């Protein structure tokens, strides 16, 4: 059974058949920021396109990068060929085609794949390789898609590709909750779905009974969808909505209305106080058992009105969960860590004082100076004297740096963890609330940010070497924060200069836990889009001053009419109204027991589009509303099982539970060290050999082909890992692979599967593993795990071999439980063994496997109980650990 999003399933299909795609191994998938940053790094290539300014607005490079990403994503998901656009007589469309081509070239040159390309590449694979499609269809007999109203053109194409002749396709959705037009989604997919089949083939089952909401709430959002359907608002639903009325499951015996308003009149302070009184009244009445029963929904949580309300509530003891409100860079722990980093580079601080960095705005100068002031204030405390002295020593060292350090910026951050307050923050117990853990999670996030900067710009140490008249350490210190100047070479420098500035401007979302969408002890502040699929006992809807706005461009409308595979479905003039009503229908329908519409009323708020429904509501301060009549539901648990593997979880926890907590629970990013490129290269090329054997193409397993596969893997690996092997190392790796192929040449037919991802669902968690090779004849199989090293001494290295044996025993358990195959033996194959027997073999012993699985289970439950006090016993493990400064080892 395949379970996942369209993107996750497409990514799985791509990885399982990578050799047939246009990608190379070790491709990198871009998130939204990475995509924009990649375009930004190459903006000079786009600006060199003839008539570029007719397709993209004349603004700053970063905003142009974002606009380009929006355009190419839309075009890609509609399967538009850039050559077709480039041939158009309209210079705007021709330029747009060139933009798409340049963008696709950049992805290809750098072995990158963006979010949209995941689906387009899977579609290309399945339509160009019928055998792959046939294999997939033979595995998939039934398809069920939820939220079908939010699918786009390419997703519809994929659904019917998967479905094939079986046509066993079930889609579920609510056309009134179609919110993702800006991502290419179209409501037509669900409205026209029955038309894809012959008469009588498609059964439509209306789902109109609502089991979530109080009947007043159901009546309210039913009325919302029809009250504004008329000439007064200049649009009608017509065929663009299923004609339906949602029916409540039952009508509670309440006299008080379940839909009310809470407002002030042109007085923001009064509005804050009324909301505070509302929440405090719920608590004092005993009706509220947890703040997480309340959710505030906004069009945007980044608006100053929203962040001011959040700060007001938090200042009055009410914790607010608002991970997308762009508060990350304002959190005290982040300001302190940035300020301390800057103090360790006095030349950069001097530049700030002299306002030398032309690409920083006054807002950025204020922010960085504020961070430095916060750091100086903290360090002035006598209790911070050790930390202060350490920063002074580092600043002096970096100011007069003569030779490269053995650390970069990430390394400096980890060194700071020796001192308070960072050491105290990292010591926070994992069983406390989300707000208490937020500082630790934010510090973990800043390690991710700095680590990615170092990766993108190939920085691993602080280097005093001079380049173009300046020390590299000074150039690199300026690059994450802001400084650069004109020309193409300078543009590259400018790109690096703006990294942290761009993140600051765009905002970073704080930690979100998929297993706890409404954290206990917090009121939730969410966007309406973010709340989709959720439900809350009490929902407070703000943003009532909002109005319908056009979200399409004239250029894209022209392209759609000429080149999209099907004409526009909804009238362009009505789209903004459709989207507006669907958005707020979604907001109103999140409420279970009580729906509150709130605003600070003024001349424009509520807007004319809400005024009628809003004016008819009872004010919650009215005698007609009695909170004591209500019983509020509790927030439902999200039953998501965590996944554990032996190598990534159990082995790490057994080595050091503290390290496990910091890396696996809090998601700190390790300081980037040289990847184990040698081992990866050997493994990937052996995988190529095995795949050829599994395709019954043993004739391709020749020294020449192996060398070609090896070279291709080395090229993609060195590019993705940003590290390289000297010629003797490459030759040694290739010799290991050729030796393996020679030794196994007579037994390729025994291979059953290679690089097997396998998982097993237990009662409260999931075990997973990746098996290098499964081979065998008859009714039994043998498991093989490859090690790209010489065979160890079985006596001196007993502990390491035992750990590998336990890993194989876990794999044996997974294979037997999932496939029913009997495992007879398990092998460690050492490709570096050039003279003797390259394997260490273990017989399958049921009692030993069961004992290992019991140990695995015990360790998992320690992790689930948040038992993270045990530290490493091995001095070697501590010496190699990034957290050695924090632990004082």
Task: Outline where the language-model segments fall.
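Mg2+/Mn2+-dependent nuclease catalytic core
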Residues: 758-852
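ATPase/helicase motor core of nucleic-acid motors
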Residues: 196-199, 257, 284-443, 447-451
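Conserved helicase NTPase motor core
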Residues: 2, 28-39, 89-192, 203-217, ...
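Accessory C-terminal helicase-associated subdomains
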Residues: 93, 112, 287, 384-530, ...
């Amino acid at each position: 059974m395949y379970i996942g999003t369209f993107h996750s399933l497409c990514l799985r299909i791509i990885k399982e058949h990578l050799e047939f795609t246009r990608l190379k191994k070790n491709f990198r998938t871009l998130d939204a920021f990475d995509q924009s940053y990649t375009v930004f790094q190459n903006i000079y290539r786009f600006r060199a396109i003839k008539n570029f300014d007719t397709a993209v607005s004349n603004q700053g490079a970063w905003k142009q990068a974002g606009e380009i990403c929006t355009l190419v994503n839309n075009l890609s998901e509609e399967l538009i060929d850039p050559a077709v656009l480039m041939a158009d007589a309209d210079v705007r469309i021709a330029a747009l085609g060139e933009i798409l081509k340049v963008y696709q070239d950049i992805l290809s040159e750098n072995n990158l794949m963006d979010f949209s390309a995941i689906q387009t590449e899977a579609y290309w694979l399945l339509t160009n390789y019928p055998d792959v499609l046939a294999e997939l269809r033979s595995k998939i007999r039934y398809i069920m898609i939820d939220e079908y109203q939010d699918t786009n053109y390419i997703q519809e194409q994929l659904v019917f590709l998967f479905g094939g002749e079986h046509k066993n396709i079930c889609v579920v959705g609510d056309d009134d909750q179609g919110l993702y037009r800006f991502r290419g989604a179209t409501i037509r997919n669900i409205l026209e779905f029955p038309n894809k089949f012959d008469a009588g083939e498609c059964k439509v089952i209306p789902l109109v009974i609502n089991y979530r909401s109080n009947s007043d709430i159901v009546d309210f959002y039913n009325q919302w969808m029809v009250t504004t359907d008329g000439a007064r608002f200049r649009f009608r639903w017509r065929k663009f909505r299923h004609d339906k009325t949602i029916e409540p499951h039952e009508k509670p015996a309440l006299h008080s209305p379940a839909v009310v308003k809470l407002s002030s009149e042109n007085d923001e302070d009064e509005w804050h106080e009324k909301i505070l009184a509302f929440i405090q009244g719920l608590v004092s009445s005993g009706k509220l058992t947890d703040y997480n029963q309340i959710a505030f929904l906004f069009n945007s949580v980044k608006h100053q009105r929203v962040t001011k309300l959040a700060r007001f509530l938090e200042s009055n003891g009410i914790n607010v969960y608002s991970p997308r409100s762009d508060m990350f860079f304002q959190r005290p722990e982040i300001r302190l860590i940035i300020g301390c980093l800057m103090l360790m580079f006095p030349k950069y601080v001097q530049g700030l004082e002299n306002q030398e960095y032309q690409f920083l705005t006054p807002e950025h100068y204020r922010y960085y100076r504020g961070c430095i002031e916060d750091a100086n204030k903290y360090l002035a405390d006598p209790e911070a004297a050790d930390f202060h002295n350490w920063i002074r020593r580092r600043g002096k060292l970096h100011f007069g740096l003569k030779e490269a350090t053995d650390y970069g910026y990430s390394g400096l951050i980890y060194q700071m963890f020796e001192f308070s307050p960072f050491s105290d923050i990292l010591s926070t117990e994992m069983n406390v609330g989300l707000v208490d853990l937020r500082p630790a999670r934010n510090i973990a996030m800043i390690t991710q940010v700095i680590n990615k900067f170092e990766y993108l710009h190939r920085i691993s140490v602080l280097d005093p070497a001079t380049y173009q008249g300046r020390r590299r350490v000074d150039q690199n210190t300026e690059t994450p924060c802001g400084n650069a100047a004109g020309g193409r070479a300078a543009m590259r420098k400018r790109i690096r200069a703006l990294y942290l500035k761009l993140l600051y401007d765009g905002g970073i979302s704080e930690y979100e836990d998929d297993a706890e969408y409404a954290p206990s002890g917090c009121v939730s502040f969410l966007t309406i889009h973010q709340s989709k699929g959720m439900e809350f006992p009490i929902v407070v809807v703000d943003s009532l001053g909002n109005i319908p706005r056009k979200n399409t461009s004239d250029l894209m409308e022209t392209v759609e009419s000429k080149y999209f595979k099907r004409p526009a479905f909804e009238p362009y003039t009505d789209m903004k109204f459709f989207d507006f009503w669907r958005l707020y229908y979604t907001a109103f329908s999140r409420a279970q027991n009580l729906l509150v519409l709130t605003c600070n009323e003024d001349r424009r708020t509520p807007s004319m589009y809400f005024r009628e429904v809003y004016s008819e509501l009872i004010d919650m301060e009215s005698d007609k509303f009695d909170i004591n009549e209500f019983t509020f539901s509790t927030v439902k648990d999200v039953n998501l099982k965590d996944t554990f593997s032996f190598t990534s979880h159990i082995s790490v926890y057994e080595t050091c539970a503290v390290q496990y907590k910091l890396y696996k629970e809090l998601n700190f990013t390790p300081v980037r060290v040289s990847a184990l490129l040698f081992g990866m290269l050997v493994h990937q090329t052996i995988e190529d050999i095995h795949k050829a054997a599994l395709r019954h193409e043993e004739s391709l397993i020749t020294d020449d082909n192996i060398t070609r596969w090896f070279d291709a893997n080395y090229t993609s690996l060195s590019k993705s890992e940003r590290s390289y092997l000297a010629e003797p190392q490459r030759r040694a790796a290739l010799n290991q692979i050729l030796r393996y192929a020679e030794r196994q040449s007579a037994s390729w037919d025994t291979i059953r599967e290679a690089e097997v991802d396998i998982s097993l669902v237990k009662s409260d968690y999931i075990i997973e593993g990746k098996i290098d090779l499964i081979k065998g004849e008859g009714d039994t199989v043998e498991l093989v795990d490859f090690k790209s090293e010489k065979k160890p001494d079985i006596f001196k290295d007993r502990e390491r071999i035992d750990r590998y044996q336990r890993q194989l025993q876990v794999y044996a358990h997974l294979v037997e439980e999932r496939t029913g195959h009997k495992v007879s033996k398990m092998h460690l194959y050492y490709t570096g063994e050039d003279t003797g027997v390259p394997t260490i073999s273990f017989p399958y012993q049921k009692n030993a496997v069961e004992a290992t699985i019991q140990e695995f289970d015990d360790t998992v439950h320690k992790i689930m109980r948040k038992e993270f006090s045990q530290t490493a016993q091995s001095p070697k493990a501590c010496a190699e650990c990034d957290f050695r400064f924090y632990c004082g080892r």
